[in-house]
């Protein structure tokens, strides 16, 4: 026993995920690491960010749409506020492209 956690920094976890992605095993890794509830929470956060960045709905409307509490929406909003406009534009682009490519894959 080493006496300390092997992964003690967020960058180490990101490197682990990047390594798995390079091997096309990222889905397996995240499925093994996260419970179904944690995966649902992550999907909710992705949808929260997408809706907040679109800016079409109020936080209360997003809460009702996604079935999450207003406090959860507020936490997501506060996190987004800590990022630059360029970072938010990049995230929106990635979310849009990923959603479109997934929809195309489902039709096949």
UniProtKB/Swiss-Prot annotation:
One of its GO terms (cellular component) is cytoplasm. InterPro entries: Trp_repress, Trp_repress_bac, Trp_repressor/repl_initiator, TrpR-like_sf. SUPFAM superfamilies: TrpR-like. Residues 59-82 bind DNA. This is Trp operon repressor homolog. The keyword Repressor applies. GO terms for biological process: negative regulation of DNA-templated transcription. GO terms for molecular function: DNA-binding transcription factor activity; sequence-specific DNA binding. Its main location: cytoplasm. PANTHER family: TRP OPERON REPRESSOR. It comes from Aliivibrio salmonicida (strain LFI1238) (Vibrio salmonicida (strain LFI1238)). Keywords: Cytoplasm, DNA-binding, Repressor, Transcription, Transcription regulation. It holds the Pfam family Trp_repressor. It is found in: Cytoplasm. This protein is an aporepressor. When complexed with L-tryptophan it binds the operator region of the trp operon and prevents the initiation of transcription. The keyword Metal-binding does not apply. Belongs to the TrpR family. Homodimer.
